[in-house]
Amino acid sequence: KDGYLVGTDGCKYGCFTRPGHFCANEECL
């Protein structure tokens, strides 16, 4: 399932398909 995780730096790390596996997609809020 797709989703996103907001880091402490305020950036969104999204597009994870499996635990610990993230695509290279970052968006700073």
From Swiss-Prot:
First-listed, main subcellular location of the protein, grouped into a coarse class: secreted
Lineage: Eukaryota, Metazoa, Ecdysozoa, Arthropoda, Chelicerata
Subcellular location: Secreted
InterPro entries: LCN-type_CS_alpha_beta_dom, Scorpion_toxin-like_sf
Organism: Tityus discrepans (Venezuelan scorpion)
Tissue note: Expressed by the venom gland.
Annotated signal peptide: none
Top-level taxon of the source organism: Eukaryota
GO cellular component: extracellular region
Role according to the record: Binds voltage-independently to sodium channels (Nav) and shifts the voltage of activation toward more negative potentials. This toxin is active against mammals and also affects neuromuscular preparations of frog.
Descriptive protein name: Toxin TdII-3
UniProt keyword annotation of Secreted present: yes
MF term (GO), any: ion channel inhibitor activity
Domain annotation LCN-type CS-alpha/beta: ranges: 1-29
UniProt domain comment: Has the structural arrangement of an alpha-helix connected to antiparallel beta-sheets by disulfide bonds (CS-alpha/beta).
